[in-house]
Design a protein with these regions (language model features):
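Extended, well-folded interaction surfaces typified by the phenylalanyl-tRNA synthetase beta subunit core
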Residues: 13, 18-20, 24, 28, ...
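Short, charge-patterned binding micro-sites
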Residues: 49-79, 112-115
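Core RNA-modification/binding signature centered on pseudouridine synthases
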Residues: 146-231
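Ordered, amphipathic secondary-structure segments that act as subunit-interaction surfaces
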Residues: 73-126
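Short beta-strand-to-loop capping motifs
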Residues: 19-21, 79-85, 125-131, 186-190
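Short amphipathic alpha-helices in soluble, non-transmembrane regions
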Residues: 89-99, 136-145, 200-202
Length: 231
């Protein structure tokens, strides 16, 4: 007698979840964000693939961690579904019902680019006058950006604090004076090779002008080295 063994085969379907991170959730660290998402995926009852081993958990990866306190409007995480026949709206609804209000899923797509291709990030930096008026803030910040070099102390993995010139890392910049703030859109290196945090420019401003400016930073988008938006 021949014993027939049947094996259930799943077709894993990678999908990219797009979400915003705002309000109180801006202050959730990347590690805590991972925990929040893990709980939401578990509660959502979505048919997703779990890692194997002693402690199986939903498989999820994030393209590029967002700095604490930053707002993100095009954040992504990748999961794997156990079936390639999925309903985008059902996934969005199921996750939003399990996530805190500061994290909002708005789209589900198939991954086009690998996270390792990310090389640039576009930030919106809003500066609010505190000890000086708006005109002076605008004048001072543009003066800072027009300097031949902008020297700051930056943490490195091997050498601790190191003085670097961040001026050459500005890929694009635009500064405008709004009704209540100075708005700066800045394209900076980001990804696995080089990362320049926009708060370094805030630190340079505060040190140069002995100020303690109020600011809000939003990451608007990330790109590959050809300037193509991450998809």
């Amino acid at each position: 007698m021949v014993q027939i063994v049947t094996v259930e085969v799943f077709v894993l379907k990678p999908v990219r979840i797009w979400f915003t991170k705002d309000n109180e959730c801006k202050y959730i660290s990347h590690l805590d964000l991972n925990r929040v998402v893990m709980r939401a995926l578990h509660k959502s009852k979505l048919n997703i693939w779990h890692t194997e081993g002693f402690n199986p958990h939903p498989f999820v990866t994030f393209a590029l961690p967002l700095s604490l306190g930053f707002k993100g409007v095009k954040e992504t995480m990748d999961i794997k579904l156990l079936d390639d026949d999925y309903n985008k709206e059902e996934i969005i609804s199921a996750l939003n019902n399990c996530l805190p209000s500061g994290i909002k899923v708005y789209d589900v797509t198939e991954p086009v680019m690998k996270a390792g291709k990310i090389a640039q990030a576009l930030f919106e930096i809003n500066l609010y006058p505190e000890t000086v008026d708006l005109d002076t803030l605008y004048s001072n910040f543009t003066e800072l950006l027009n300097q031949p070099e902008i020297l700051v102390m930056k943490k490195t993995k091997k050498k601790g604090l190191k003085e670097i010139d961040i001026k050459p890392h500005i890929l694009k910049v635009n500064v405008a004076k709004e009704d209540d703030c100075v708005k700066c859109n800045m394209l900076l290196p980001a990804g696995s090779t080089t990362n320049i945090n926009p708060t370094l420019f805030i630190n340079a401003y505060n040190e140069k002008y002995s100020d303690d400016v109020i600011y809000r930073i939003t990451r608007l988008d990330v790109f590959n080295d050809k300037g193509e938006s991450f998809k």
